[in-house]
Amino acid sequence: MTRRRLLLLAPAGLLAAGMAGAGAWWAARPSAGGASIGGPFRLVDGDGRGVTDQTFHGKAMLVYFGYTHCPDACPTALQDMASAVGELSPAEREQVRIVFITVDPERDTPAVMKSYASAFGPGVEGLTGSPGAIAQAAREYRVYYARHEEKGGEYSMDHSSIVYLMDKQGRFVSVFTHQTSPDAMAAELRKVVG
């Protein structure tokens, strides 16, 4: 190979190696679509006690944002998460918490959240808080929500419907949609708690 050809190919090789390295770095990042997912929050549990993201440190979390008056997506997602956790061994189940965060703090008081969450079994935490605290938690998880006014003074909440899998250190692992089966969720949970 001539020196001139080598001088022409060297920069192209360096560029290709750099792009491959950048691609590997990008693929390994704990994010979805380039945005980091998860972070600190300060909310209130069903007993009115303050909780933070650190309350769940050492446990894997399935995090879902919704509301108790949700007619379909929220109960379906919570049932799917509960079914997935139910497929785990007792020792694995102890390492997982389902964290249901309301996007409707006006109606979803601590008592309402506790009652609603308990319908889906043990290990389900219903969290609420001030509108500002809910907005902060939603920003950390990149969750969309908005109040939709209806006739007669009633309202519903529009919201993203994604389950976030976080590891025992609170780091983002994966997302699940309504197309994800409880079996597939359980398989991913086993990787995180195993």
Indicate residue ranges for each PLM-predicted region.
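N-terminal targeting signals for export/organelle localization
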Residues: 1-40, 44
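Short, small/polar residue-rich loop motifs at catalytic or cofactor-binding pockets
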Residues: 36-38, 60, 158-160
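Short, acidic, Ser/Thr-enriched surface-loop or helix-capping motifs
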Residues: 45-46, 167
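Generic structural signal for well-ordered beta-strand positions
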Residues: 51-52, 173
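Short active-site neighborhood of thiol/selenol oxidoreductases, capturing the structured segment around
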Residues: 54-75
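Structural microenvironment flanking redox-active thiols in thiol-disulfide oxidoreductases
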Residues: 76-137
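Thiol/disulfide oxidoreductase modules built on the thioredoxin-like
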Residues: 133-188
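Short, hydrophobic alpha-helical segments
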Residues: 192-194
